[in-house]
């Protein structure tokens, strides 16, 4: 009998998101005869947590969560917090680390200051994957605190558009054995920025089970408002990089041309209040519907008339791939991976990121 390989994936949580969904899909494809699967979560929580296969071993990574505030808030906030609590020596030490970071233009030393002394994962693995990458704390932890024969970084987005610590990423990924990138375009961009790492990179598309998506569409909720016009749908976290505000402006332009439309947004996030206020200020309260976060949005995807992905940047967009499982026309902005995903799609179009260009793309499927 062949010995199973122990493989470990590290990410932050299982809250609803593209990275988390892609992990669930990936784990469903791994052979249980070949792999003994382990998942580390900084916070073992989230609506997608029950979707992890029952044979997966879960590891809460308190090494990172105990320093969460220090790692994620601005360093000066941490230093001021130390001063307010009377920890003057710690504040001085942290301040000198902060100065080193500013001079070196990298926050590697800041993360190292907190994570260098943690114990790490006790077990040894054949493969360890920093799945939520590039993320400085995740990449650091897998690099130095997880014992494994092979270490893999996983890049889920366009690193030219997302604010990563390039110096730290170069250092850490230089110590990895392989770097998987979720789209051809994403790999090309990564290789241009990190020429010395290009021999380590390989495209690994996010996995989508078309049959599973269709099955879930049959049992999930869908539109229930008896609207008779055209329904446009966007699924994704309500945040600046996902482009919902531009989509609302595009809807305004389309309604001015007398199209009978209603735009539905599935998701939740930091921009929800701003988007609702924008819809109200533009007089679109009856034409914009916020449906909230849905673990299973596939009934909406199946029954919408047009699906729009207005993102500012992506890597390989999971929600776009899921929408393509159905027959509705798809409009996507020109983020990394969009053209890769929509190639050979008769009912798909890639447009620019302005409201005018998105509106024009939608209009192609209204006339």
What name fits each language-model region?
Residues 20-25, 230-253, 259, 270-276:
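A conserved mid-protein helix/loop that constitutes part of the nucleotide-sugar donor-binding site
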Residues 138-139, 177-201:
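A short, active-site helix/loop in glycosyltransferases that binds the activated sugar's phosphate group
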Residues 160-165, 191, 202-229:
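Acidic anion/phosphate-binding donor-loop and adjacent secondary structure
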Residues 293, 312:
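Aromatic "clamp/platform" in nucleotide-sugar-dependent glycosyltransferases that forms part
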Residues 298, 316-325, 339-340:
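Short alpha-helical segment that forms part of, or immediately flanks, the ligand-binding pocket
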Residues 344-355, 364-366:
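Conserved acidic donor-binding segment of nucleotide-sugar-dependent glycosyltransferases
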